[in-house]
């Protein structure tokens, strides 16, 4: 097992690669100018390289600063806390920020090797089979249901009466069979529940992690093909900003289950869409439209924390599992609809009603629940990264205010897969006091300046007052051309107020 190099500089990746070489070949000689060269004898002595001929792996826990290796006899040895801290501080100071003395000629390493609990060839057929069978099972349900209806319609009256009598005689057996099926379904459901280590909530998982990771890799290839001409280069300041935020969030939350297990890779797409998403395999996609919509790094940190929370919590696999379960139950109801409805037109109408009921009663409410959970965990990730969490609700207030200014129609929340902007802002406002306490626990510096939420409300109030006075001024001029002009109050632009708060 090797290191996974993620959002690291080329020099730090070279050092980690050197530590891996040290583990495999027992020797690694860094350049003379590397500040880490004088510390390697202590590493060799602690790991016993003079007596042990081979080791299997070297592990670096970034925030805990422990360098460990697994020996051939399956035992592990770690540097002491003081030695690990010294090595970690040197690694961070001299390599993360671009010191070239350790590796002047090495390019950045994006990914070395992925972890697998099963061979990729064994993992491939299952998710691909699910994708293929999903439309097939719906077609099969329609064919079976329609066939049952045609069979029943073709039966003569005497055979229909005979069949009804048989059902009445065996009703208890049928009831017992249905009860057994229901019991098996309940057992299947509860045996596929898993408890999230982050939230403690039980969730249904029907898709294995490796199988779903393969699906994520396939989805990643599709997105990369679509965005191949719109990706910003790694030298672009916007890319570097997003990379810095993602790296800071993940490094400050290494103790959160799942964060350290994912190799986070950043992609910035040149697009006016206000959007960002993270695939379950750690591929982060951020659109420049979102970068233009946020006011400062605090808002961007919260939004990326929200997307990272989706990946860490496994929401994609959870939603896919729910969809598979509902598809199975829907197949039963679909068969019944096509069997009971006397005409195909009525069956099509019944199928449409069934799909809409499933969408608006299960799919969309569940999606809104997952979004709210990602908001909560994303706010906690941002708080542990010492972000001004008060800016989180301001972003959604800005989005709501912008939509109202543009006159966009306000749809009911139950029609959407996401909570409304106003409800999200209110929900975050209720969570912010707890997030501020978490910042204090993490020894973050105290927040300075006024509350950005108050600044935003005052700014909006001034904008609305000035707008009303301008409208009143125009109306008075039309009615009384000779009237004295009304003195216009000084307008406080939105960008100025928010920029002033950011500078503070």
From Swiss-Prot:
Residues 42-122 form a propeptide. GO terms for biological process: cellular response to stress; cristae formation; diet induced thermogenesis; energy homeostasis; glucose metabolic process; HRI-mediated signaling; integrated stress response signaling; lipid metabolic process. CDD domains: M48C_Oma1_like. It is found in: Mitochondrion inner membrane. Disulfide bonds join 386-444. Residues 144-174 are annotated as: Stress-sensor region. It is a single-pass membrane protein. Residues 1-41 form a transit peptide. Its main location: mitochondrion. Keywords: Autocatalytic cleavage, Disulfide bond, Hydrolase, Lipid-binding, Membrane, Metal-binding, Metalloprotease, Mitochondrion, Mitochondrion inner membrane, Protease, Transit peptide, Transmembrane, Transmembrane helix, Zinc, Zymogen. Binds 1 zinc ion per subunit. The active site is at 307. Residues 123-174 are mitochondrial matrix. It comes from the Eukaryota. Autocatalytically cleaved in response to mitochondrial depolarization both at the N-terminus and C-terminus to generate the short active form (S-OMA1). Autocatalytic processing at the C-terminus takes place at residues 426-435. The S-OMA1 form is unstable. OMA1 pre-processing by AFG3L2 may participate in maturation before OMA1 autocatalytic cleavage. Degraded by YMEL1 in response to membrane depolarization. Protein turnover is regulated by prohibitin (PHB and PHB2), which promotes degradation of OMA1 in a cardiolipin-binding manner. GO terms for molecular function: lipid binding; metal ion binding; metalloendopeptidase activity. Residues 127-146 are annotated as: Cardiolipin-binding. Its EC number is 3.4.24.-. The stress-sensor region regulates proteolysis and activation. Homooligomer. This is Metalloendopeptidase OMA1, mitochondrial. It comes from Rattus norvegicus.
């Amino acid at each position: 097992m090797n290191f996974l190099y993620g959002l690291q500089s080329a020099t730090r990746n070279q050092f980690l690669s050197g530590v891996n070489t040290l583990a495999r070949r027992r020797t690694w000689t860094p350049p003379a100018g590397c500040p880490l060269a004088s510390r390697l004898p202590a590493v060799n002595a602690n790991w016993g390289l003079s007596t042990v001929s081979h080791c299997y792996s070297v592990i670096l826990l970034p925030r805990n600063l422990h360098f460990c290796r697994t020996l051939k006899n399956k035992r592990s040895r770690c540097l002491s806390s003081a030695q690990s801290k010294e090595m970690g501080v040197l690694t961070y100071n001299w390599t993360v920020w671009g010191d070239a003395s350790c590796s002047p000629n090495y390019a950045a390493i994006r990914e070395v090797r992925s972890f697998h609990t099963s061979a990729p060839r064994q993992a491939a057929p299952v998710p691909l089979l699910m994708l293929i069978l999903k439309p097939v099972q719906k077609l099969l349900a329609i064919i079976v249901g329609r066939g049952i209806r045609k069979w029943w319609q073709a039966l003569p009256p005497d055979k229909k009466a005979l069949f009804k009598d048989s059902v009445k005689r065996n009703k208890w057996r049928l009831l017992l069979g249905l009860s057994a099926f229901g019991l098996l379904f309940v057992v299947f459901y509860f045996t596929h529940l898993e408890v999230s280590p982050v939230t403690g909530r039980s969730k249904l998982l029907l898709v294995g992690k490796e199988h779903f990771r393969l699906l994520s890799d396939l989805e990643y290839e599709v997105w990369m093909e679509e965005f191949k001409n719109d990706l910003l280069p790694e030298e672009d300041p916007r890319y570097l900003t997003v990379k810095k935020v993602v790296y800071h969030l993940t490094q400050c939350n290494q103790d959160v289950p799942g964060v350290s297990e994912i190799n986070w890779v950043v992609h910035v797409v040149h697009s006016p869409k206000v959007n960002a998403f993270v695939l379950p395999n750690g591929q982060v996609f951020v659109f420049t439209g979102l970068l233009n919509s946020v006011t400062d790094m605090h808002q961007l940190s919260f939004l990326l924390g929200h997307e990272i929370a989706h990946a860490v919590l496994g929401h994609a696999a959870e939603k896919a599992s729910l969809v598979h379960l509902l598809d199975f139950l829907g197949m039963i109801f679909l068969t019944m609809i096509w069997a009971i409805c006397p005409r195909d037109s009525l069956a099509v109408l019944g199928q449409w009603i069934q799909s809409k009921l499933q969408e608006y009663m299960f799919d969309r409410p569940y999606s809104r629940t997952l979004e709210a959970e990602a908001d909560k965990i994303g706010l906690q990730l941002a708080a542990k990264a010492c972000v001004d969490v008060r800016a989180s609700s301001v972003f959604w207030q800005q989005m709501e205010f912008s939509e109202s200014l543009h006159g966009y129609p306000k749809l009911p929340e139950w029609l959407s897969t996401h909570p409304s902007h106003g409800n999200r802002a209110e929900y975050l406002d209720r969570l912010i006091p707890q997030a501020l306490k978490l910042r204090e626990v993490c020894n973050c510096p105290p927040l300075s300046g006024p509350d950005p939420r108050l600044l935003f409300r005052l700014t909006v109030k001034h904008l609305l007052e000035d707008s009303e006075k301008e409208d009143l001024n125009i109306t008075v001029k039309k009615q009384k051309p000779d009237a004295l002009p009304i003195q216009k109050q000084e307008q406080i632009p939105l960008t100025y107020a928010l920029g002033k708060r950011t500078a503070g």
